[in-house]
Every structure is written in C-alpha cells, then in structure tokens.
Amino acid sequence: MKRRYFGTDGIRGQSNIFPMTPDLAMRVGIAVGTIFRNGAHRHRVVIGKDTRLSGYMLENAMVAGFTAAGLDVFLLGPIPTPGVAMLTRSLRADIGVMISASHNAFRDNGIKLFGPDGYKLSDDIEQKIEDLLEQDMSGQLAKPEDIGRAKRVDGDIYRYIEQAKRTLPRDVTLKGLRIAIDCANGAAYKVAPSALWELGAEVVTIGTEPNGVNINLECGSTHPAALQKKVHEVRADIGIALDGDADRVLIVDEEGAVIDGDQLMAVIADSWAADGMLKGGGIAATVMSNLGLERYLQARRLKLHRTKVGDRYVVEQMRQDGLNVGGEQSGHIVLSDFGTTGDGLVAALQILAVVKRQGKTVSEICRRFEPVPQVLKNVRVSAGKPLEDAAVQQAIAEAEAQLAKNGRLLIRPSGTEPLIRVMAEGDDRGQVERIVDELVNVIGGVRNAA
C-alpha cells in the first residue's frame, strides 16, 4: 500500500508545505498519542530537535497535539537523534520524537518516531498512524482534567554525553590526539566537542555556530571539503564529520582523504572480531554498500547481510540475525551494544579506540580495502512506472548479464524523492559507466514518452 505521509525515515518535506506543516504536526501528535497512551500510568513523550529554524514551529505544534491527547511532554532542545532514542528509554517515555531532516538543507524538516524501546516504529505502527491521520480525531482528545503538561529538560543532553563517553573502552583515552570535528551547525554542536574534550583530546571545531539556516550548509558529512581544509590547516590527526542530526559520520584522515561508512564498518568489524565482541559472524549493510566491503569480509570468514536502503532496515536485520554491527555507506553506523539507532559520535569513538590502541595513523587504520568502481545516477520521474516497461526490463536483463559475477546492478525508486536511482559496480569502471548511462537513457526515454 502506498503511504501518504511516511517515507523511509519518518515524515519529511519542505517546511510549511504539506506534509511538513504545523497543522499536520499537531495531528501527528494526536494520532501517535492515541496509539501509545495504553495503560493506567501517566503517559509521557520526549521531543528533541536539530537546529533548523522550523524546529520551533513544529515542536510547538507537536506539543499541542500530544498534550491534547493527554500526554506529558519533555522538551530536550537540540540533541542528536541517538540521544532521543536513548532518553526515550532512560526517561521511561511511551514515545520519542526527533524533529529533523537529517542531512537536508534548513528548508526541509522531518519527524522521526521511536517506540518505548528506543527503536524506530515498525511499518505496521506507521500505517496505523497514517490511518488515524485520515480520520476525524476529535473523539480522541483528552478530557479537560487529563490534558498533558510540557516542560523543558535541557540538562538531559549531558546524560547522552556520558552515555557516549562510556562506549570508549576504559583503557583508552584520547590524550595526544588533535581532532578536528565538523558538527554541521546541527544537533551535536554542543555535545560532540564536549565529549571529545572530556575524553582528553585537543579539539578543533567547525560547524558549531548554528543560526537556524546554516545547518548542513557547505559543512558536515555531506560536504566534507571544509573539514578536509581544516585538517590540513591545523595538522589534525583525524577529522570527524557529522550530519545535521548526528546519526551519521564520515572520517577524514590525516592526509585529507574522506573515509566512508563502508570502510568504517570494516574497521569496527575487524577490531570487534579480534576482541571477541562481534556477534552473529558478520554485519548488516544496505544494498548500496560497496562490493569491496563484501569481499573484504568474506576473506575474513565474515558475512555481509544486505538490506533495503534505510538504517531502520539495517536495525531490523541486525535484530533478526543477532548482529551488533551494521550501517550504511553514507555513514549511518549502528552498534547495538551501545544504542538502537545510528550514532555518529559513538561510531567515531570506536574508530578512535582502534587508532589509539594500534598506534597507527588514521590512513593506515581506515583504508581496509580498495572499493570496487561504483557509479550512481538518478533519473527524475514525475508519474508512471517506467521500471515496469518492457524495454526497461530488457535493458536491465542485458546489463545484469554483462556484469555476471564481476559486479552488481541495483535499480530502485528513492524513498524520499521522485527519483529512480541507477547504480552499478564492477571491476571494469568503463563497463560500469557504460551500463549506467545506457540504463539512464532507456529509463529517461520511457519517462519522457509517458
């Protein structure tokens, strides 16, 4: 069933344009509150946000919805997404909300929802919310004496800092490391530098002056050039780039090279396997992760469990197969020993632990495998189903035959934008580029004909 509101990571869109309007945010609060107010106890919700301007508007709208449904609201202020997941459990809340559009520009915003266990909601529960949003919910409002209250609990972000610090092995400190960190002018602008400094590092910061409109603006994990420049400028041992809500991370080594999530997962999997910490004999990663990662793990008798795109599907696979490491090439790294969702700061701390223990440079630690050439292009579509066209299906079959066992082909609709993503990878870059270009032309031709 096609859903109207929820995508692969909650509800997302441009602020003040459907579905990211204050009216819908209030209705989401009522709908979610209706579903999660089971039991006789006083129900509560925690709400965090990143630093984008529209966060104030949406936060207040959701407070109105939740309190109207009879839930008390704890407002955390700017805090990383994993902090919301952690505090949802710690504060015994019935629901957790993160208001963020992650790595998107300030004009966008989104609503991510966590259950009382700190995990993102299942597709079934999201469908129940969608069903309620299509109904008249006036009958679901609380009695006057049962309306909820709201209060700010800004100090609870320090509980998240302490939780993150505890994930660094006790025999490791960060003394002697010069770390440049880019917080994307986002949710981690206070907590991440504080945690690194308290663990003993010399910390150089960029992207820590949010003004409501500069989140992810030429900074953060999607724009690492600023951090690469800073690493060179201050001769840092390592650069850490977070995104707007700090649930993803990329690393810049001492030479200025960017290290993506695939390489980071390889480092953590290798280290944890050697220490007897890795569970399930492998890791979970999405279909977008490089074939080089899969080959690297296979050579070490570890299995790569592939999932659909989206960290929520990575987490589902991890829970199903008993894995404790998973993630995405984009830098979502999920370490279930420490949390229930991607956590950029915690993942970075695990890399720093390996660097300190082995006494090697970041470039020596993090370049674990040579990525297989990978080409990704997008085709914009406004209507129709071009992937069902006979000519497109024939072109896909021919491309798969060309790649055979030497590569991979992935064609999928985007979960957040009106795009079809065409990705191929293989040992022969020229062949991969030709295949992607041919498929883009065929899909684009069908789109235009429609």
From Swiss-Prot:
Q: Which cofactor does it need?
A: Mg(2+)
Q: Which GO terms describe its cellular component?
A: cytosol
Give EC number(s), comma-separated: 5.4.2.10
Keyword entries, A-Z: Isomerase, Magnesium, Metal-binding, Phosphoprotein
The record's free-text note on cofactor binding: Binds 1 Mg(2+) ion per subunit.
Q: Name one GO biological process term.
A: carbohydrate metabolic process
Q: Which InterPro entries match?
A: A-D-PHexomutase_a/b/a-I (IPR005844), A-D-PHexomutase_a/b/a-I/II/III (IPR016055), A-D-PHexomutase_a/b/a-II (IPR005845), A-D-PHexomutase_a/b/a-III (IPR005846), A-D-PHexomutase_C (IPR005843), A-D-PHexomutase_C_sf (IPR036900), Alpha-D-phosphohexomutase_SF (IPR005841), GlmM_bact (IPR006352)
- Residues modified as Phosphoserine are S102
One Pfam family it belongs to? PGM_PMM_I
Question: Known post-translational modifications?
Answer: Activated by phosphorylation.
Positions binding Mg(2+) in this chain are S102, D243, D245, D247
> Which cysteine-cysteine pairs are annotated as disulfide bonds in the entry?
none
Q: Where is the active site?
A: S102
Q: Which NCBIfam families match?
A: glmM (TIGR01455), PRK10887.1 (NF008139)
Primary role: Catalyzes the conversion of glucosamine-6-phosphate to glucosamine-1-phosphate.
Q: Which family does it belong to?
A: Belongs to the phosphohexose mutase family.
Q: Any idea what this protein is called? A: Phosphoglucosamine mutase
* Species the sequence originates in: Rhizobium meliloti (strain 1021)
Q: Which gene encodes it?
A: glmM
